[in-house]
Regions:
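Structured interaction and signal-relay segments at domain junctions
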Residues: 1-64
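Juxtadomain coupling helices with adjacent low-complexity linkers
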Residues: 1-9, 37-44, 48-52, 84, ...
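Short amphipathic alpha-helical interaction segments
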Residues: 63, 67, 96-99
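A short beta-strand signature within small-molecule sensing/ligand-binding domains used
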Residues: 64-76
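Short hydrophobic/glycine-rich mini-motifs in sensory/regulatory modules
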Residues: 75-85
Length: 117
């Protein structure tokens, strides 16, 4: 439900992952990506504990099935990585605007706080 609401508000697809799989999906590619195992590049990216925005060059973006990763915000619970909020897109999609990136980071922070409780 959270991914659905966030996707509607942001106007783009939203994925939520744990450390191994996509656990929630909304928007384009939802059925293809739900329950998919995380690619090793995404696992390494989340372990950096930083907000990620894809490079402008589509050839350098991380692939998620038939989609591309445009933004990733790690979910940090008590200092440990528990997953992330991901914004997928196509190779032709523009990079997300600053307010969309901030919303993904806020969503990850909210989920982290909720998991800490």
């Amino acid at each position: 439900v959270y991914a659905d609401v966030l996707a509607r508000r942001l106007g783009c697809g939203v994925l939520v992952c744990d450390r191994e799989h996509i656990v929630a999906a909304a928007g384009a590619g939802k059925n293809e990506l739900l329950h998919r195992e995380l690619p090793p590049e995404l696992d390494r990216l989340l372990k950096k504990r930083r907000l990620y925005t894809a490079p402008a060059n589509p050839d350098r973006r991380i692939r998620l099935g038939g989609r591309w990763l445009l933004c990733a915000a790690p979910i940090l619970v008590h200092g440990d990585i528990e997953g992330g909020v991901l914004l997928p897109g196509s190779a032709r999609d523009p990079l997300p605007e600053a307010e969309v990136i901030r919303a993904a980071a806020t969503a990850a922070e909210f989920l982290a706080r909720w998991m800490e409780e």
